């Protein structure tokens, strides 16, 4: 699907400004306002909200002069740049990396003995503090002032941050480069051959669609859907200012009502009502919806049954799931990645022959020529492995960690967005958990565990904001807008670089200049994710630790077998209702948050399709897209109000 349309200078310049704005709003809303997390979803609310404002501004400018207006292609170029800016400035990179770099210096104490265990293995180019000079009783000032704020007119120590940020930025660019090349390879198979729907790309395309069928913004159902979350979050926001205004509760915790055995083993089971979540899930096939919520409920039933037999149920390290379920998921990921490879084999053979000179596939309209994509993927992958090795990781472990991350975890997460429309990319295991199935953690050695404590927190543990999905959705948007795919290469690269620079500057400035420093900002980046990697490896640093036991390999095999069965049934019988992707995602934070909106959407859509058919579904789509637009737009509105008025904002149902 080719096109001669490229990226205009006007769209590029506006995109730069919009990307910088998305960085600043995301960073302030998530870190300072705290209640509004608007950047870490795979379709960030800040992007949708700002895009609505951009559409209104473009319409107003067009009335003044046709030359001032923006074409759909230009609007979607700006949208794509904001998409990457929001991801990078949130959990996609910066909120995890920046606090991490001063965490060992600030949180080391005589009790945890991090200075003895970790500091000797930290390379000085990795961090802004001096690891050869641990100050346990009084942290080095670069870390102390970051977490407690600057007093007495001291300046921000920018010079201490520049070097480490450059090195970590290089690692991020290598990983992002591998994802870019992988997306270029996957696009034709997933879009043209398998015809995946890419639900997260549908809303922006619909918002700029020309006015046939009354147009998206002229459709009453669009605004009716918009009004539902707009009214709810207006009331909830006003309730924070004026308690007499009623508040509509969007969160119920089932575990609070399951107090008697064996139901008290159900674990953390919230019911969040996200209108945007219902809207996105409505776009999915009914069998996918059923699989997603069914397998999540099955995890809770497994815990209840295991509890009734007094089975030992340790938790998965630093994940909110039980170990026996986490390793089922791991087995599912490995089989699902193999299944995706299997169904892609004919296409991959064509790519290989094309790169060898046989010329079986025309890659002139792809993001990258196949030969460049394959070479780039190998170079970026090996470059990241060299970075890990330079930081102190054994080369074999670096290749293993990156291999599991890129070709299994990230691949399945990208598929969950492209096919399952999931708003979050979260899994239930890290690459190191695969190693732990075969050997205890302490056998890795202190140097390896030190590097893992950093890269787990920075890249491997929390995958929200995974840019691989941004590349794939961006290419789908380019196709929908008839934009030349290769023209989007500049859009992708520039947006990432702008986000890394603008976001890093602001997120270093903010804790130093805030009252109370990072300790008074959102706790997840400054007192949770940044610490968990070090606390996880701390027992193994102290001495030998036991392995994960029989549950890990046993339930890995169970998960692999179940997924193989589901994949075979789905491949062989089109009527089979259970999707292996639903099983692979069953224990993730994604489904913990969104299982209830998925259930609601399944009930609605199954009845719409049963009693109204495809025609009714098509007519109802604008209502559900309007709910997405309404919830996300209100998140941006309240973030801006909270920033301007220094006032509370309502919580939104995607923690």
Residue ranges and their predicted role:
Residues 320-323, 493-497:
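Membrane-embedded transmembrane-helix bundle of lipid-linked glycan/lipid transferases
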Residues 2-468, 502-534, 555-557, 567-574, ...:
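Transmembrane-helix bundle segments that line or gate the permeation/cavity pathway
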């Amino acid at each position: 699907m080719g096109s001669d349309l490229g990226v205009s200078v006007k769209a590029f310049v506006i995109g730069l400004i919009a990307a910088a704005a998305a960085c600043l709003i995301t960073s302030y809303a998530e870190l300072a306002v705290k209640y509004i997390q608007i950047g870490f979803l795979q379709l960030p609310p800040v992007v949708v909200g700002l895009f609505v404002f951009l559409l209104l501004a473009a319409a107003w400018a067009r009335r003044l002069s046709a030359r001032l207006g923006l074409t759909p292609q230009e609007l979607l170029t700006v949208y794509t740049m904001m998409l990457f800016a929001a991801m990078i400035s949130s959990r996609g990179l910066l909120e995890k990396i920046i606090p991490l770099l001063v965490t060992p210096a600030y949180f080391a104490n005589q009790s945890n003995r991090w200075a003895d265990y970790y500091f000797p293995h930290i390379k000085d180019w990795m961090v802004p503090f001096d690891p050869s000079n641990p100050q346990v009783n009084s942290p080095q000032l670069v870390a102390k002032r970051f977490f407690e704020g600057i007093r007495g007119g001291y300046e921000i120590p920018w010079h201490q941050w520049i070097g480490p940020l450059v090195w970590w930025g290089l690692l991020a660019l290598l990983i992002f480069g591998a994802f870019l090349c992988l997306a270029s390879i996957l696009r034709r198979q997933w879009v043209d051959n398998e015809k995946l729907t890419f639900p997260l790309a549908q809303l922006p395309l619909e918002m700029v669609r020309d006015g046939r069928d009354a147009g998206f913004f002229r459709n009453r159902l669009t605004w009716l859907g918009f009004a539902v979350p707009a009214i709810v979050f207006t009331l909830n926001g006003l309730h924070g200012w004026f308690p007499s205004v009623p508040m509509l509760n969007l969160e119920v915790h089932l575990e609070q009502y399951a107090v008697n055995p064996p139901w008290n083993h159900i674990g953390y089971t919230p019911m969040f009502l996200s209108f945007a979540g219902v809207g996105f899930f409505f776009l999915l096939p009914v069998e996918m919806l059923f699989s997603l919520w069914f397998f999540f409920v099955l995890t809770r039933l497994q815990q209840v049954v295991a509890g009734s037999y007094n089975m030992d149920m340790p938790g998965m390290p630093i994940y909110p799931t039980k170990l026996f379920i986490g390793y089922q998921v791991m087995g599912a990921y490995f089989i699902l990645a193999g299944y995706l490879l299997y169904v892609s084999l004919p296409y991959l053979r064509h790519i290989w022959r094309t790169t060898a000179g046989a010329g079986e596939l025309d890659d002139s309209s792809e993001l990258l020529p196949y030969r460049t994509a394959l070479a780039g993927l190998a170079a970026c992958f090996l470059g990241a492995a060299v970075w890990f090795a330079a930081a102190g990781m054994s080369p074999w472990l670096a290749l293993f960690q990156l291999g599991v991350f890129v070709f299994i975890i990230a691949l399945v997460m990208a598929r969950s967005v492209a096919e399952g429309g999931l708003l979050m990319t979260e899994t239930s295991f890290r690459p190191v958990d695969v190693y732990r199935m075969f050997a205890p953690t302490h056998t890795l050695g202190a140097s390896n565990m030190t590097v893992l404590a950093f890269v787990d927190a920075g890249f491997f543990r929390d995958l929200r904001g995974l840019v691989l999905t941004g590349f794939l959705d961006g290419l789908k948007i380019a196709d929908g807008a008839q934009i030349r795919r290769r023209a989007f290469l500049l859009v992708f690269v520039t947006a990432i670089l702008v986000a890394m620079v603008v976001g890093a500057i602001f997120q270093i400035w903010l804790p130093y200049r805030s009252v109370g420093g990072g300790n008074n900002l959102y706790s997840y980046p400054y007192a949770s994710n940044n610490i968990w990697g070090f606390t996880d490896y701390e027992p193994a640093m102290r001495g030998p630790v036991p392995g994960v036991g029989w549950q890990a390999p046993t339930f890995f095999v169970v998960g692999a077998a179940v997924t193989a069965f589901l994949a075979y049934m789905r491949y062989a019988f089109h009527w089979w209702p259970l999707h292996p992707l639903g099983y692979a995602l069953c224990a993730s934070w994604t489904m913990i948050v969104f299982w209830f909106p998925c259930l609601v959407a399944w009930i609605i859509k199954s009845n719409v399709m049963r009693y109204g058919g495809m025609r009714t579904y098509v007519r109802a789509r604008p209502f559900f897209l309007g709910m997405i637009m309404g919830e996300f737009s209100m998140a941006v509105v309240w973030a801006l109000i909270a920033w301007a008025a220094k006032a509370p904002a309502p919580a939104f149902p995607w923690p």
